[in-house]
Structures are given as C-alpha cells and as structure tokens.
C-alpha cells in the first residue's frame, strides 16, 4: 500500500484536493491523508511539522509514503518532520516536487493501479506535460523520451474503439483505463493517430488528447495480452467509467438552456397524517408487523431503483439502493425488536422512536452534507409508518403548471410529482445538500430551500413565480 500525504498551508485547499484525488483512488492500494493549516482560528494559514510527523506515523504500515508540498515552508515542515521520526520509518518517505494538484492525481491513479514506487514518482514528475502540451507550452523531453516507442512482434494483439465520451479521454476515464491495465503482465500501448502512449500511464494517455469521435487502438503483447484486450473492450463498452447519455446509434450533445424563472399555481404538499395507530397486541405480532413493513419497503425500493436507473441514471438509483441498505442494518432491526419486546411498544411506536432518534443524531452533525441525510431518515420512517397503517401514497394530477410548497420534502415524496405538471418546488426548510435537491435537479425541477415558515400562509392556487436566479419565490399581485 502507498501512502500519500498532502502538505499545504490551507486545510481547505488540502481537503478539496483530497476529495478530487479520491475520484481515482483504490483504497486497498492507496491511502490519502492531509497535514494542512495550523490550529489557530484567527490565523489558520500555515504549516506544522508536528502535524506532518503525526501524518507520517499514521501511515507507518505503508510500503512507501509520498509527501506532496505546496510552498516553501511546507517543504521545510516536511524536512523537519523527517528529522523527528524514527530513521527506519524515514527511509520509506519520499518528498515529491511534482505540482500539487496534477501530482496528487497522478500519484493516486498510478498507486491505485499497483505501479511501483519508481513508476509512481515518474508519473508525478510528468504530470504537467498534458496541460503544457494542450496550451502549446514548452515541454522539455530527452532524446530517449522521444524515441521511447515500443516495438511489437507479429504476435501482438490489437483492438480498436471509437470514443463516445463527450469530453474524450479526460482525466477520470484516463485514470480508470490506466488503473485497469496496470494489473496485466503485458506490454500495452495506446495509439491515437501517430501518437503513442504507455497504456498503463494516466499522464501519457492524457497526452494523446483523445476527443469524442476519435479512434484509438490498443496494442498488447505478453502473457496477459488477450485478457488485457478483453478488459479494455469491456471498459470501453462502458465508456471508460463515464456515465453518458446515448440514444440508439447516434449521440447528440448540446448545451443546457438555463431557465432562471418558472411560474405556476401554489399547491401545498400534504403529508400523510391519517395513519392508523393500533393498540399493542403481543411482542410477536408487533415484531411481525414491523418486519413485514421493512420487507415490503425493501422490495419497493428495489423496484423503484431499477425504474429510476432507466429514467434518471445510476446516480439517482443508488440513492434508493442506499436506503435499502440502511433497512438491512442488523443493529437497526435489533433496536426496533428490542423496543417492542422490552418497552412493550407497538410496531408503529418502535419504528417512530428509533427513526426519530436517528434523525436527531444526523441533525446534530457539523458536516452539512451528512446533516442533510436526516431528510432521508424521516422519509424512510414515514414510508414504514404508512405501510404499517396500510396507507398508500396518493396519486397527483395537475391541469395547470404547479409549484409545490412544503416544510420539507423527502426523496420518495418528491417522486410523487414526476411526470406531472409540477414545474418547481419551494421549501420552508430543507437543505440544498439533500438527496431531494439532487433528484430535483435530475428531474429538471428548480427547487428553493430555507424560505421560512411564511410560505405556509400562501393560499392554495395562488399564482407564483420561482426564480433560481434571484433565489426568491414571488407571489403575483
């Protein structure tokens, strides 16, 4: 395993780069941490040798540890940290002079593909070449590098592919391809016209500057050549990991039209409040009711995810697959069972209490993204309670363009309005980081959150304008 430490004056910068590099990361082969900023709220910009030392020590199990630094004093902190740690551990550490962003991506991609430490460091040092070539900047190459093309025998295998990705083989598909092919014992070369690249090198693939519609050729020779060809073809069929929209045999790519304002009639979303709360029977009966509700919802989520995968893509489908996984959590099911058996709660009350506690825990988190997941928890709770009460989601039909008003809206509640005349959503509360907002964007629905409780005073059927541009809901006079 390779350890990568991002040493920066700014924690925000390091965390952002960590997030970007994680897109290329195989966590079994590459571990990334940051050592950035100083613990001073007033003046947080700076570097701390002790932080760097602790970061290195936390990766002591790694085969090699690579440090990437942003500016001069970060390098000094890294060098000081090496003086503070055990000499045997220090021998594993490599200080890398590659550019911070490009170097981090190159190191992550190469390490995730199982490259050797020398290959990883070489990839990092060459990380600027793709950008330099695209900008016609000066790139210094040695004579050996210019004549580095591999010579293949007549036994070499080849396969070709016309790239469909709208952005060509940009950094993510290039990283996926290099990572995939790095595992094969074979000499592999990717060709684009007269250009050639080591197919195990993300940087070299990027240097080919492959665009949509370009034909590329993979040449393979060695023990695993056929397996490498097969793997390449399979990844190519999936557009090198990119999720792109295709229709039949042609793909038409255009620009999104920005619609800043929509108009429609107000409709207040009505949560299901008429739920049947039965009296406690026996713990066996209540447990059976709770289990039945959970199993029914899991089946529904499976079906919904498959439908949404076809309609909106895997990203949206995975939201509901995640909901299903939560319902499979043994600890959750055990908590509901214990609430029924030990506290003589009904299935309704047990589910309500457990999910309410879980929702509160999420709302208390500092991370806004994780905090917003309480909306999913509330949504799952409501669906389970409706199942126990034998209440179905009401169907919706609107003859006029409509803007939905609500305090909050769960993902499943929003989906009630797909394929209807709903043109926008306005929430008194909610969160811009919620799955509801992600789904709304995929549905093409403008949505505003945190508008305040005054929207509940708007009369039904009032004419409204919802403006994304000004982030406002306007009541027509």
From Swiss-Prot:
Location of the HPr domain: 156-243
Keyword Lyase attached: no
Active site positions: 9, 170, 435
Domain of life: Bacteria
Residues in PTS EIIA type-4 domain copies: 1-135
Any GO BP annotation: glycerol catabolic process
MF terms (GO), sorted A to Z: phosphoenolpyruvate-glycerone phosphotransferase activity
EC number of the protein: 2.7.1.121
KW DNA repair (keyword) present: no
Keywords: Transferase
GO cellular component, one term: membrane
A family per Pfam: PTS-HPr
SUPFAM superfamilies: Enzyme I of the PEP:sugar phosphotransferase system HPr-binding (sub)domain, HPr-like, Phosphohistidine domain, PTS system fructose IIA component-like
Region ranges (PTS EI-like, N-terminal part): 269-477
Swiss-Prot/TrEMBL catalytic activity: dihydroxyacetone + phosphoenolpyruvate = dihydroxyacetone phosphate + pyruvate
Domain notes: Consists of three domains. The N-terminal dimerization domain has the same fold as the IIA domain of the mannose transporter of the bacterial phosphoenolpyruvate:sugar phosphotransferase system (PTS). The middle domain is similar to HPr and the C-terminus is similar to the N-terminal domain of enzyme I (EI) of the PTS. The IIA domain of DhaM (via phospho-His-9), instead of ATP, is the phosphoryl donor to dihydroxyacetone (Dha). The phosphoryl flow likely involves HPr ('His-15') -> DhaM (His-435 -> His-170 -> His-9) -> DhaL-ADP -> Dha.
Self-association state and partner proteins as the record states: Homodimer. The dihydroxyacetone kinase complex is composed of a homodimer of DhaM, a homodimer of DhaK and the subunit DhaL.
UniProt miscellaneous comment: Unlike the carbohydrate-specific transporters of the PTS, the complex DhaKLM has no transport activity.
The protein's role, per its UniProt record: Component of the dihydroxyacetone kinase complex, which is responsible for the phosphoenolpyruvate (PEP)-dependent phosphorylation of dihydroxyacetone. DhaM serves as the phosphoryl donor. Is phosphorylated by phosphoenolpyruvate in an EI- and HPr-dependent reaction, and a phosphorelay system on histidine residues finally leads to phosphoryl transfer to DhaL and dihydroxyacetone.
Protein name: PEP-dependent dihydroxyacetone kinase, phosphoryl donor subunit DhaM
Gene source species: Providencia stuartii (strain MRSN 2154)
Source lineage: Bacteria, Pseudomonadati, Pseudomonadota, Gammaproteobacteria, Enterobacterales
């Amino acid at each position: 395993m390779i350890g990568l430490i991002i040493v920066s004056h700014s924690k925000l910068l390091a965390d952002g780069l960590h997030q970007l590099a994680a897109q290329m990361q195989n966590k079994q082969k590459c571990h990334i941490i940051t050592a950035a900023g100083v613990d001073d709220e007033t003046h947080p910009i700076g570097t701390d040798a002790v932080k760097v030392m602790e970061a290195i020590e936390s990766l002591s199990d790694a085969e090699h540890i690579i440090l990437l630094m942003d500016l001069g004093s970060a390098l000094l902190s890294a060098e000081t940290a090496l003086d503070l740690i055990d000499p045997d551990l220090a021998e594993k550490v490599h200080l890398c002079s590659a550019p911070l962003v490009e170097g981090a991506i190159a190191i992550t991609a190469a390490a995730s593909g199982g490259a050797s430490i020398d290959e990883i460091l070489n990839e990092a040092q060459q990380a600027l070449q793709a950008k330099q070539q695209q900008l016609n900047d000066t790139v210094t190459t040695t004579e050996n590098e210019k004549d580095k093309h591999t010579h293949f025998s007549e036994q070499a295998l080849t396969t070709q592919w016309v790239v469909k990705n709208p952005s060509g083989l940009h950094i993510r598909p290039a990283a996926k391809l290099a990572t995939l092919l790095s595992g094969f014992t074979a000499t592999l070369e990717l060709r684009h016209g007269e250009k050639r690249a080591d197919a195990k090198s993300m940087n070299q693939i990027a240097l080919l500057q492959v665009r949509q519609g370009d034909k590329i050729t993979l040449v393979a020779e060695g023990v695993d050549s056929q397996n490498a060809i097969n793997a390449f073809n399979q990844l190519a069929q999936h557009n090198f990991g990119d999720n792109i929209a295709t229709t039949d045999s042609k793909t038409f790519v255009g620009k999104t039209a920005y619609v800043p304002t929509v108009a429609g009639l107000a409709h207040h979303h009505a949560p299901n409040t008429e739920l049947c709360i039965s009296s406690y029977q026996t713990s066996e009966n209540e447990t059976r009711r709770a289990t039945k509700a959970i199993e029914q919802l899991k089946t529904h989520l499976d079906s919904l995810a498959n439908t949404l995968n076809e309609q909106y893509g895997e990203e949206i489908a995975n939201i509901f697959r995640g909901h299903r996984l939560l319902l499979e959590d043994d600890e959750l099911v055990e908590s509901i069972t214990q609430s029924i058996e030990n506290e003589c709660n009904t299935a309704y009350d047990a589910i309500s209490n457990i999910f309410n506690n879980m929702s509160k825990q999420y709302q208390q988190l500092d991370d806004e993204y994780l905090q917003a997941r309480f909306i999913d928890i509330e949504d799952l709770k409501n669906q389970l309670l409706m199942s126990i009460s034998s209440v179905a989601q009401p169907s919706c039909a609107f003859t006029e363009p409509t803007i939905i008003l609500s305090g909050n809206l769960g993902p499943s509640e929003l989906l009630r309005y797909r394929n209807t005349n709903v043109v926008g959503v306005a929430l008194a509360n909610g969160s811009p980081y919620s799955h509801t907002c992600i789904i709304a964007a995929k549905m093409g629905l403008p949505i505003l959150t945190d508008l305040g409780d005054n929207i509940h005073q708007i009369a039904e059927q009032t004419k409204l304008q919802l403006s994304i541009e000004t982030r406002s809901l306007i009541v027509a006079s």
